[in-house]
Amino acid sequence: MSKEKFVREKPHVNVGTIGHVDHGKTTLTAALTKVLSEKYGGEKKAFDQIDNAPEERARGITIATSHVEYQSDKRHYAHVDCPGHADYVKNMITGAAQMDGAILVVSAADGPMPQTREHIVLAKQVGVPNIVVYLNKADMVDDKELLELVEMEVRDLLNSYDFPGDETPIIVGSALKALEGDKSEVGEPSIIKLVETMDTYFPQPERAIDKPFLMPIEDVFSISGRGTVVTGRVERGIIKVGDEIEIVGIKDTTKTTCTGVEMFRKLLDEGQAGDNVGILLRGTKREEVERGQVLAKPGSITPHKKFEAEIYVLSKEEGGRHTPFLQGYRPQFYFRTTDVTGQLLSLPEGIEMVMPGDNVKVTVELIAPVAMDEGLRFAVREGGRTVGAGVVTKIIE
């Protein structure tokens, strides 16, 4: 049996490193690939391979990210590491690399620093469910009490942003030593301990297919003698012929029944997460449905106009605005498949204006309701040009 085949059978989890600049996130990423490839097979990546992160685009925004993979005894991990602080902010807000759990890297020599705090805040805002801590550069700290002090500081910081700081696992080690093949406690064993902790502390995420059905509507057709067909890509769950579904967003919510599912012009019994399908709706007129609405399992999602969000505003160099904007700013918010105009009702206290390149918490009111839940991503656009990205952090009404 080939090794590659074996990898696929383990459950898959997405993780990433977060933390202050130069605290060792990329070194730890390299150490994870080295130590685990030696133990479980797979490819090891050198520091500079990871550090030269390729650029990718998500929601019209360019982000530099490195993707590596490794496996533990129980799982297959896909791990994302970003070279610069701005890339982390953009990555977390756009959800370009969704994280089921984050590894917070803190230098034992420096303790928590401004970006440590900022990354914890962002992780909370964008819904990263769990954090484990790797207290790095422990080989540079001889004083056991100092280590304990840093550990307490990190726990307090996590607690202050509603993560369970007291229960959070903290692994003490040196990513550099592990990379050099050091077998002492802070070396390779700390990496094995970290991944074993991730295996137990990060719960297995619910698969998209097991969640309630949702499909954003991309197009609507009328087929004579058969009725109305809507097309799109199933985002989550399963749709079966005969299922009752709701049409949510833009207008009042209505109920209908799925009377047919087709893919590649073939009729199917069901469509599932990831499929591009056409869904035939019973008794629904073509003008009653439009792009921007969603089909969903009844009661699973509701339409809203007013919400809080964390947004990243593109800098001028990234093709964004050249000037700041104020409260009352009215761009379009692109949710899933359509633009909806909205207004910035409020900015954080003491912030008069938002500069290109900033990330900020805002309250938005849309002119039409959109099917949303917390964690939904969107783009901020002006006349079709992307000027920012955001994530819904709290629904107001």
From Swiss-Prot:
Assigned GO CC terms: cytoplasm
All copies of domain tr-type G, residue ranges: 10-206
Binding site for GTP: 19-26, 81-85, 136-139
CDD domains assigned to the protein according to its UniProt record, in alphabetical order: EF_Tu, EFTU_II, EFTU_III
Chain residues that bind Mg(2+): T26
Enzyme Commission code: 3.6.5.3
An annotated GO BP: translational elongation
InterPro entries referenced in this protein's UniProt entry, alphabetically: EF-Tu_GTP-bd (IPR041709), EF-Tu_GTPase (IPR050055), EFTu-like_2 (IPR004161), EFTU_2 (IPR033720), G_TR_CS (IPR031157), P-loop_NTPase (IPR027417), Small_GTP-bd (IPR005225), T_Tr_GTP-bd_dom (IPR000795)
Record family assignment: Belongs to the TRAFAC class translation factor GTPase superfamily. Classic translation factor GTPase family. EF-Tu/EF-1A subfamily.
Protein name as it appears in the record: Elongation factor Tu
Taxonomic source organism: Coxiella burnetii (strain RSA 493 / Nine Mile phase I)
Name of the coding gene: tufA
